[in-house]
């Protein structure tokens, strides 16, 4: 174990060069012209012992401002939620942790059952008939939903609310460009989709209408009013939803949604820089054969024993590449398992209580903000986020908050120029009354 971190020692290199008949490394790469070779010093630091390396990395990690040491009010699509301890124990089991898409499902029954349970729980939350095994993230799921709607309706226009997550809208535009699909954005009014503008935007050429519930500003969109407008001209209604919110809100399926997508990050997946996340994708039965990604089904073997299989695989790229419903050929099975473990540990009542705490704490924070003289940007019901207008740049406000051990909210001006100096504040079940009061007090002091 003397050289356990070295892929090849000097002796190893000599033996390999001898085996291929080369004297030196330069001789090995003789076919590469001198003028294109990298000639500079790599500037790699001198090797360290394991103890020295651990000490250096620990010192670097201490520079991070994490949600354990600091009270985080940053959301905007990634949230600091309670993670049941059991989640890491479940996903760390070797039979799950090292597993990839089970192409031999008959020998991966545990993996398939775990995915099947994930699909079942997503269906219960969304009120939909069928859910797939997962997608890369919420943005990818939304874009894939738009592609499904376009293919199903044979139309090339997608209408999307400006109150949908800006990064999801960017992903959609990337997908749409290659498919020659027109993306039309409908403005928001008082924090929710402008219904009058939506009505004017939808026409006979519209494949789908996309809204977010709760939306990017934390507001609860009026799906009951949006549904008839969305279905005008036989277009599809796509709803992007925070799955935790669906533990207490009326599910999109009850309002007539055709496709419900979102990100399962609130369940068992920590807020980490860049992910990974876990998208979910649920549809009505009529769209079952057009769903992207893997589908796990329950069946019986010849002896009557329950079993699980990958079903309807003719939709998939590895079976019929030229006629596949999507070019997505993988999923986030491990993160889907984490979400399943978290939802199972919480139970139905636990999910509902967790969602209720988000609503109550965010509402308390919003009321306290108003009392402190802060301008709350939008009226109407919210889930766990709300926007306030500040008298100084959000970046500066967050710098000051950080000095007091608080990670502030998202700068809405980054995505919405008209909302310059507006901060989007997220309040989850982990934030205490003391920390909420501390945040509002400091923002109030800065506001004066």
From Swiss-Prot:
Lipoprotein among the record's keywords?
A: no
What InterPro entries does its record include?
GcvPA (IPR023010), GDC-P_N (IPR049315), GDC_P (IPR020581), PyrdxlP-dep_Trfase (IPR015424), PyrdxlP-dep_Trfase_major (IPR015421), PyrdxlP-dep_Trfase_small (IPR015422)
Q: Which reaction does it catalyse?
A: N(6)-[(R)-lipoyl]-L-lysyl-[glycine-cleavage complex H protein] + glycine + H(+) = N(6)-[(R)-S(8)-aminomethyldihydrolipoyl]-L-lysyl-[glycine-cleavage complex H protein] + CO2
GO annotation, biological process? glycine decarboxylation via glycine cleavage system; nucleoside metabolic process
Q: Which keywords does this chain's UniProt record carry?
A: Oxidoreductase
Q: What is its EC number?
A: 1.4.4.2
Q: Which family does this protein fall into?
A: Belongs to the GcvP family. N-terminal subunit subfamily.
User: What task does this protein carry out?
Assistant: The glycine cleavage system catalyzes the degradation of glycine. The P protein binds the alpha-amino group of glycine through its pyridoxal phosphate cofactor; CO(2) is released and the remaining methylamine moiety is then transferred to the lipoamide cofactor of the H protein.
Protein name (database record): Probable glycine dehydrogenase (decarboxylating) subunit 1
Q: Which organism is it from?
A: Bacillus velezensis (strain DSM 23117 / BGSC 10A6 / LMG 26770 / FZB42)
Gene name of the encoded protein: gcvPA
